[in-house]
Design a protein with these regions (language model features):
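Short, flexible coil/linker elements and helix-boundary hinge sites characteristic
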Residues: 23-27, 47, 62, 148, ...
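Ser/Thr-rich, Proline-interspersed low-complexity disordered segments
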Residues: 17, 31-95, 561
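N-terminal non-cleavable signal-anchor helices
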Residues: 9-10, 22, 42, 53, ...
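Solvent-exposed helix-coil-helix hairpins and adjacent flexible coil/strand "hinge" segments
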Residues: 34, 180-185, 529-531
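Flexible loop/hinge segments at secondary-structure junctions
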Residues: 85-227
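Hydrophobic alpha-helical membrane-insertion segments, chiefly the h-region
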Residues: 11-26
C-alpha cells in the first residue's frame, strides 16, 4: 500500500479546519446564521430593519453550554426571514358633517335669544351681557367658522373647555358667559337660546333640521345619537286651578266665559298698593299685549298637565267665600279647549262634594277628553296613572295627596291616592313594568304659603326619585317654591297658583309654568315662566328679566343647593 506524502496530509487537515469556520459554524458569539449582521439587526422579509435581540454565549459567561434544542441548520440552506411586526392599524378618520349647534348660557338666565352681532361683541369685549364666549376645544374653530367670526389673537374673551360636560358645569360657575354646544350635547343644566328668533327646543321649535340656521362641520358619531327635532317632545305643567268663588264670578257673572282664564298674554306690574284685607302690599297689573300666548303654550305642548283643585259635580254650589269648593262643569270647557291633556285630582278639595261628587268630576273631565290621575272609586282606581304616548315614548303620570287624610281612598272608599312611600314605590314599579319610559310624580303636599320644602318633604321626594321617578312636580303651597336637583332629577316642590282668586298677597297672585323639552326618554331643556293672575282668573306672563324677576328670585332663594 502506498502512503501519501506528509505535506499532502498536512494540507488536507488544514483545509478541513478552514471550511467550517468560513461557513459560520464555529465562533464565540451567537449562531445568527448566514447573512446575519454583527450588530444583531437582520433584514426582515419587508426589507426594513427590525431589532432582533441577541444572546450571550454560555461559554463566554464561564457556564458550560447546554445541549442545542434542535439540530444546527444546514450551512447550505437559505436563512429563515425574520418576521416584521405589522404596522398598527390607523385610527378611523372621523367623518365630518353639518351638525346643528345651539347658543347656550347658564340655567338661570332670563335672556331667550342671541345673534351673530352679540357674539362678535362678546369676543371684542364690548358686550354688556356676557364676559366671554366658551367653546369646546376640539370644536372651537369649526364653530367660529360657522358663526362667521375670526378666532381672536392674544388675550381674548374666548374660553375653551375640554368637553361639553365641562362647559356646562362652567356656565353655572361663570354666569356671564355665552357658549355654543352641538345640539346633541345640550342638557337641562343650561339654557338653550334662540338664534335670530329660531328655536331648536321648546313648543315653538323648528320642525326639521333644514329649518335650523346654524350648523358647523363637526365629527359625527352613530346615527342614533344625532339630534332630530322631530324626535323631541314637550310637556307643559301648571299649578293649581280652582273654578269656584271669585274665579266663577269673574267668568260667569261678568260674562267673560270659560275660555277667559287661558286667553292671557303678557303683563306688567305698574305699581304696588297697600293694602289687601290681610294688610299686605299687592301689585297693580296691566296687560302688555301678546294675547293668547298662554293658550298657545298649552296647546302647543305634546302633554299639558295641571292640578284641578275642586270637584265639578253635576249639581254644584257656587261659594262666595270659604274653603269648600265646587265648580260648574261647564267651566271645564275652557280647560279642554286650551289644550290640556291631564288633570291631577289628588288634593285636599277633590272630595268637597263627597264621594259621588268626586266620581261625577272624573266623568265630567273625561267627557271633555281629559285624563285624570290621583283619585277614583277606590284605592286601585286612585293609584292608576294617566298614560300618554308621544312619538313612541310612553309617559305615566302618578298623582298623590298628602294633605287630606280623610279624603284618601281605600279598597271600599271613593277618594284620592295617599302619598305614602310604599304606595308610590309600588306604583312606579308597576308603571315601568307596563312599559312606561318616563314617570312623572305629581304630589299635593307640603305647607301652604311657604317657599322652602320641609325636611320630611325633601326626604320623601328623594325616596321617590330613588324609587325610579324621572321627576316630581308638586303643588299645594300656592307659592312658586323650592326647586331641587337630586341625582340629576328635578324636583319642583310647588309651582304656585295658575287660576285662583287669592288676590290678597303678591305671592299667591303669582306662579310658575314649566315648559320641558325631552329627547326621547331624557329631559333636554327646562324653561320656567313666571306669571301673574289678572282679574282673579287669568294668568299672564311676566318678563323674567323685569317684573318676573321677583318670582324667579323667590324660587332661587328658596333653593340654596340648586347646582344649576
Amino acid at each position: 500500500m502506498r502512503r501519501a506524502p506528509l505535506f499532502v496530509v498536512l494540507g488536507l487537515l488544514a483545509l478541513a479546519l478552514i471550511v467550517p469556520v468560513a461557513g459560520g459554524e464555529l465562533g464565540f458569539g451567537s449562531g445568527n446564521g448566514a447573512g446575519a449582521s454583527p450588530s444583531g439587526v437582520a433584514a426582515g422579509a419587508s426589507g426594513q430593519a427590525t431589532l432582533v435581540p441577541t444572546t450571550t454565549s454560555a461559554a463566554t459567561e464561564g457556564v458550560a453550554p447546554s445541549a442545542p434544542s434542535a439540530a444546527p441548520a444546514d450551512p447550505g440552506s437559505a436563512p429563515t426571514p425574520t418576521s416584521t411586526p405589522a404596522d398598527p392599524t390607523p385610527a378611523p378618520i372621523a367623518q365630518l358633517a353639518e351638525v346643528p349647534i345651539v347658543p347656550v348660557t347658564q340655567f338661570r338666565a332670563t335672556v331667550t335669544n342671541t345673534t351673530r352681532k352679540e357674539v362678535a361683541a362678546v369676543l371684542a369685549g364690548t358686550s354688556t351681557r356676557y364676559e366671554a364666549l366658551e367653546l369646546v376645544a376640539g370644536e372651537a374653530d369649526a364653530v367660529l367658522a360657522a358663526l362667521g367670526v375670526d378666532r381672536p389673537s392674544g388675550l381674548s374673551h374666548l374660553v375653551e373647555a375640554k368637553d361639553s360636560a365641562t362647559l356646562s358645569t362652567d356656565l353655572a360657575a361663570h354666569r356671564k358667559r355665552l357658549a355654543f354646544l352641538r345640539a346633541d350635547a345640550v342638557g337641562p343644566s343650561v339654557r338653550a337660546l334662540a338664534w335670530g328668533g329660531d328655536s331648536l327646543f321648546g313648543v315653538d321649535r323648528v320642525s326639521a333640521l333644514k329649518d335650523w340656521p346654524l350648523n358647523a362641520s363637526l365629527p359625527v358619531g352613530d346615527a342614533a345619537s344625532a339630534f332630530d327635532p322631530a324626535a323631541t317632545w314637550t310637556l307643559f305643567a301648571g299649578g293649581d286651578i280652582m273654578l269656584d268663588r271669585g274665579v266663577a264670578q269673574a267668568l260667569k257673572v261678568t260674562g267673560r266665559g270659560a275660555a277667559f282664564p287661558f286667553s292671557g298674554g303678557a303683563a306688567d306690574i305698574t305699581s304696588r298698593y297697600c293694602c289687601s284685607p290681610f294688610g299686605w302690599k299687592v301689585p297693580r297689573l296691566a296687560r302688555a299685549g301678546d294675547a293668547g300666548a298662554v293658550r298657545k303654550l298649552i296647546s302647543g305642548a305634546d302633554i299639558a298637565l295641571a292640578n284641578f283643585e275642586n270637584p265639578a259635580p253635576d249639581h254644584f254650589t257656587w261659594h262666595s267665600k270659604g274653603t269648600v269648593f265646587s265648580a260648574d262643569p261647564a267651566l271645564i270647557d275652557g280647560i279642554a279647549k286650551a289644550g290640556f291633556d291631564v288633570m291631577g285630582i289628588a288634593n285636599n278639595h277633590i272630595r268637597d262634594k263627597g264621594g259621588p261628587g268626586l266620581l261625577q268630576t272624573v266623568k265630567n273631565l273625561k267627557k271633555r277628553g281629559l285624563l285624570t290621575a290621583g283619585a277614583g272609586k277606590d284605592l286601585t282606581a286612585a293609584r292608576k296613572p294617566a298614560v300618554i304616548e308621544v312619538g313612541g315614548v310612553k309617559v305615566a303620570i302618578l298623582a298623590y295627596d298628602a294633605i287630606a287624610g280623610s279624603y284618601h281612598a281605600t279598597a271600599t272608599k271613593i277618594g284620592s291616592a295617599p302619598l305614602a312611600f310604599k304606595v308610590v314605590t309600588a306604583d312606579i314599579k308597576a308603571a315601568r313594568a307596563a312599559g312606561a319610559d318616563v314617570v312623572v310624580v305629581f304630589p299635593h303636599w307640603g305647607v301652604e304659603y311657604r317657599g322652602a320644602a320641609g325636611a320630611g318633604q325633601q326626604r320623601l321626594a328623594r325616596q321617590v326619585i330613588d324609587a325610579g321617578a324621572d321627576m316630581i312636580i308638586g303643588n299645594h303651597a300656592h307659592w312658586a317654591a323650592e326647586m331641587e336637583i337630586y341625582k340629576g332629577k328635578p324636583i319642583w316642590y310647588a309651582l304656585g297658583n295658575l287660576v285662583f282668586d287669592q288676590t290678597w298677597s303678591e305671592e299667591t297672585m303669582e306662579g310658575l309654568t314649566l315648559e320641558l323639552t325631552f329627547r326621547g326618554k331624557g329631559l333636554a331643556q327646562v324653561r320656567m315662566r313666571p306669571h301673574a293672575i289678572l282679574d282673579k282668573a287669568q294668568p299672564n306672563f311676566l318678563d323674567p328679566a323685569k317684573d318676573g324677576k321677583i318670582v324667579m328670585d323667590r324660587v332661587f332663594k328658596a333653593s340654596p343647593d340648586l347646582p344649576w
